[in-house]
Curated annotation (Swiss-Prot):
One of its GO terms (cellular component) is plastid. The chain crosses the membrane at residues 6-26, 64-84, 89-109. Keywords: Membrane, NAD, NADP, Organellar chromatophore, Plastid, Plastoquinone, Quinone, Thylakoid, Translocase, Transmembrane, Transmembrane helix, Transport. It is found in: Plastid, Organellar chromatophore thylakoid membrane. Belongs to the complex I subunit 3 family. Its EC number is 7.1.1.-. This is NAD(P)H-quinone oxidoreductase subunit 3, organellar chromatophore.
C-alpha cells in the first residue's frame, strides 16, 4: 500500500490550485490584443486629459503614520480573537496577551521618541 494515499485529494487540490491561475495567465497572454499605440500609453485620469505630472512626491511623514497605523491595526486583528475567547483561555493566555501589548507599547514609545509621530 502506498503511504501517501491519504493525501491524494490534497495533491489534486494543489495541482488544480496551481493549474487554474497558470491557465488564466496563459489565456490572457494569448488572447490579449498586441497593439501598442500612443493613446494606450497615456495616463487615464477620469476620462480627461491629465493635469501635471504623473509622479507626485509625498512627504515621508505620511509613510511613517501609515506604518504605525498598520502595526497597530494588525495588533487589533491579533487581539480580537483573544478578547472573544478570554474566559476559556485562562491565565497563561492573559499573560501572553499582556506581553504582546507590552512589546507594542515599547514599539510605540520608540517611534514617538524617534519623532515618527511628530509632523514638524
Amino acid at each position: 500500500m502506498f503511504v501517501l494515499s491519504g493525501y491524494d485529494a490534497f495533491l489534486g487540490f494543489l495541482l488544480i490550485a496551481t493549474a487554474v491561475p497558470v491557465l488564466a495567465l496563459l489565456t490572457n497572454k494569448i488572447l490579449a490584443p498586441k497593439s501598442r499605440n500612443g493613446e494606450r500609453e497615456l495616463t487615464y485620469e477620469s476620462g480627461m486629459e491629465p493635469v501635471g505630472g504623473a509622479w507626485i512626491q509625498f512627504n515621508i511623514r505620511y509613510y511613517m503614520f501609515a506604518l504605525v497605523f498598520v502595526i497597530f491595526d494588525v495588533e487589533t486583528v491579533f487581539l480580537y480573537p483573544w478578547a472573544v475567547a478570554f474566559h476559556r483561555l485562562g491565565l497563561l493566555a492573559f499573560i501572553e496577551a499582556l506581553i504582546f501589548i507590552a512589546i507594542l507599547v515599547i514599539a510605540l514609545a520608540y517611534a514617538w521618541r524617534k519623532g515618527a509621530l511628530e509632523w514638524s
